[in-house]
A protein has these predicted regions:
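Sec-dependent signal peptide recognition
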Residues: 1-9
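Cyclophilin-like peptidyl-prolyl cis-trans isomerases
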Residues: 16-311
Length: 311
């Protein structure tokens, strides 16, 4: 009887509870990407040709690095909104000449190209710092633009672009993501063991598992092929076995310090622009002479933000 009464009491307790207030569904990301277009997709060259001058942003020379190889120039745009201390430190290192006669010391297939002050890796900087506190994420801030993509992402609640950089965010924080061309800070196992004396660029399929585990400070906007086409290292993790195999560059300089006549002035399409929204949509709903089945969605790292010579 006690068992029956106990069961009855439990049943009554469950039945007599007041109805729970329906849980509101989380707000969906607000995106300016339009719905499925009718007919064939416009081409990216057509979209860019119709863009206006105001839809392009000049890449600031003060936040640009030139990595000078005999074969050409790799240009890196820095992201002070997301890694202000590392950006400042890398510029200080460049200005003190720390990077002169450096080299690419690691090229791991489908992963990264990494470079350092190879002539004397243990030499301490004179002005810049060897290590800094990690800047894996930053607090979410409505004053920093974030152009949301409408499609779900495996690694983050929301993804999109912040000032033309691929980025992600959750309820409290924001961070830059590891897409092709992303530039990050090499470190050891300890989170605060890097500072910018060693840097890397992603040259393969996007290793998004690195997000929020390494400080990201920029992206390659021109010349990535000079890194991605280098011979692969044969030692562990793609390092070159011998210094003779290193691929050397003459220097890394802040573009603002380079005479105007020697600069490569660039513009990037604003990711809050109507033309960029059209560009994303033409890739989400790609339908042309070759593509017959549009997917209706796109991954963050499958979108390349256009860059052009300054006009």
């Amino acid at each position: 009887m006690r068992v029956v009464l106990a069961l009855a009491a439990l049943a009554c307790a469950a039945a007599c509870q007041p109805a729970a207030t329906p849980t509101a569904e989380p707000a969906k990301p607000v995106s300016n990407i339009p719905a499925q277009p009718e007919g064939l997709s416009p081409s990216i060259p057509e979209i860019l040709a119709a863009s206006t001058a105001g839809e392009w942003r000049v890449i600031d020379p003060e936040n640009t690095l030139y990595m000078e190889f005999p074969e050409g120039r790799v240009i890196i745009e820095l992201a002070p909104d997301f890694a202000p201390n590392h950006v400042a430190n890398v510029k200080a290192l460049a200005r003190e000449g720390y990077f002169k006669s450096g080299a690419v010391t690691r090229v791991q297939d489908n992963y990264v190209a990494q470079w350092a002050q190879a002539a004397d890796p243990e030499r301490l900087p004179k002005v810049g710092q060897k290590t800094l506190k990690a800047e894996f994420t930053r607090p979410r801030d409505t004053n920093i633009g974030f152009d949301v993509l409408p499609d779900p992402d495996t690694y983050a609640p929301e993804v999109g672009f912040s000032n033309s950089f691929p980025a992600a965010r959750d309820a409290s924080s924001m961070w830059l993501t590891h897409c092709y061309g992303t530039v990050g800070v090499g470190r050891d196992n300890e989170p605060d063991s890097g500072g910018g004396t060693e840097l890397y660029a992603i040259i393969g399929q996007s290793p998004r598992g690195l997000d929020r585990n390494i400080t990201v400070l920029g992206r390659v906007v021109q010349g990535i092929e000079l890194l991605s086409s280098l011979p692969r290292g044969t030692a562990e993790l793609g390092f070159y076995e011998k210094p003779e195999q290193y691929h050397r560059y003459t220097d890394i300089r802040v573009a603002a310090d380079v005479p105007a006549a020697e600069r490569t002035d660039l513009q990037t399409l604003r990711t809050d622009s109507e033309s960029f929204a059209k560009l994303v949509n033409t890739r989400r709903w790609r339908k042309d002479a070759f593509y017959h089945v549009p997917q209706g969605r796109i991954g963050l790292c499958n979108i390349n933000v256009p860059v052009r010579a300054a006009q």
